[in-house]
Amino acid sequence: MSSKSPARIAAMFATVAAFATTAMTPMIATAQPMQDAQAVVAPAPHVRLTTPWTDEALKAPVPFPEYPRPQLVRTEWLNLNGQWDYWGGKGAPDARLAPGSAPRFPEKTERVRVPYPVESMLSGVERLGEVNLWYRRGFEIPAAWKGRRVRINFGAVDRLATIYVNGTRVGQHEGGYTSFGFDITPLLKPGRNELVVAAFDPSTNDGTLGKQSLKPGGIFYTPSSGIWQTVWLEPVGQAHIAKLDMTPVVGEQRLALTVRAGETKGLQVEAVALKDGQVVGRVRGAADKALSLPVPQPRLWSPDDPFLYDLKVTLRRDGKVVDQVDSYFGMRSIEVGMVDGVPRPLLNGRFVFQFGPLDQGFWPDGLYTAPTDAALRFDLEETKKLGFNMVRKHIKVEPARWFHYADKLGLLVWQDMPQAWDAETDLAVRAKTEVEWREIVDQLRSETSIVTWVIFNESWGDFEHRRMAAQFRAMDPTRLINAHSGINFAPHDEGGGDLIDLHDYPGPAAPTYQPWRIAVLGEYGGNSLKVPGHMYRPESKCCYHLFDSAAAINDAYVAQVDKLRGFRADKGLSAAIYTETTDVEEELNGFFTYDRRVKKLDFDRVSKVNKALIDGR
């Protein structure tokens, strides 16, 4: 638990429940959920909202049939999503123990729909507080894969996952936001094989959990435990491409590329960049070595022109092809520069005002998991239609396909780090959190759309801001660092990173820029409107200012953006984030209702004022 007492936490939630109509106070901002593992219970009473994609998800024999890894695509793979056996609740074994052999499942088991969290409606389980989660399914290896290695891949499992094949432990992974996989070839047999996944997820403060809470309410939401992204098998060679690290170097008209292959002896790499199907650059070299792929006269990626180059990478040994993958990349730069004496974020050498919504990434039917791939894309498409050019992904890491759509649609992304509350005071939790954050940065470093890493939010589980800013800079010197979003909720500002970030509800307000730090408004707005029939909890009034009509909330939104236009011109404000894309459980702040069925604001009117702010008109 955090150093903050349960009594103080309860008082903070009482304050949140009052839904203040003035600027948010530090007391609200530092409120945290009480996170003690508890008995298995049904989710708190609420309306079981469906989305336009719920029926499709329920009927799909294999949910999310799309290839899950757009920047490392292989043509052969086997999707393991769908119905699995499930064993959870009080009788399930402790998944932390991870014995060498999988336990015997009961004769009668429940069924769970993968990859939806067990707390979600779409999973078919829909229970809260199941700490030990055991999954089982059978599979057969296609005959065409004979003679090759077989890897099993997981998009994400929250929080500690142990994998078994045919009863034998394969490996373990900790961290609910990063992908992982194992070579399972030695354990396979002809015909039917058995896969068991054990997940331990107490949803407690000693691990990264974002805005999940065992006692959801106000600005914290229902947890998402266990498997919540796609599971799949793929055949590979003994030597194969494991990862591509790509960094555009616009000033030198090249892509810095490293092809991770693990085994490197005798391996040669060829990478080819294509523009509209035509080869524009080629490089050959060794695996696991830094390569420079020419991209002459690059067409630069931006929200106005989100152009992406195709990339084909081939791995050879003694002239023979041993692996080949398809990928893509965008050419863009992001840096801090002075414009008329004001520090500004420069995209491709030009100041672009960054404006977008706070995006929580929750769904009433799937929680952390969107019901379908089309739904995953929908939120970003609508963000673009609203005239925004960026999105702040709030304290959650999305599947790779979400970033793929941000890349394709042209949305700048601020990526938050999921916090662990206890990292503030517990050094062991802090060390584990830092490891997970390094894995997140490493996993996402090739995504074109990500321009800013956000380390801490409103002092939640925070520690050593300046050191962490330096650490993120060392991990990735090519992006902007926001060491602490909402510095007005911290005891003090250590001055790290590239941004000085204020939160103001309903606002807006602007911080004073510094010679080395850009002034941004990391959160504001939170304008609320009830839409009967589309509310997760009909009695909710959350949060910050509740309007009584669509006309009133639209007028308030436009007035707030007009103020931002003045702050851009007079106070050097360079970015702003409005809360939020959609309603989330008790929160009623969205452009859409939580079920994505009702637009709460006038999108045409919003788009016009948003574009005027971005364009400086």
What residue ranges belong to the model's regions?
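Substrate-binding/catalytic cleft of secreted carbohydrate-active enzymes
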Residues: L380-E381, M390-R605, V609
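Accessory beta-strand-rich segments of carbohydrate-active enzymes
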Residues: W87-G89, V125-E126, E130-H240, T264, ...
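Extended carbohydrate-recognition surfaces in non-catalytic/accessory domains of CAZymes
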Residues: D36-N153, T208-F220, S224-I227, V236-G237, ...
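Beta-strand-rich binding/interaction modules
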Residues: V165, Q253-G285
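Bacterial N-terminal signal peptides
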Residues: A11-P26
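Bacterial N-terminal signal peptides that target proteins for export
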Residues: S2-A14
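Surface beta-strand/loop "capping" patches
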Residues: P235-T264, R344, I614-R617
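N-terminal carbohydrate-binding accessory modules
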Residues: L244-M246, K312-T383, A612
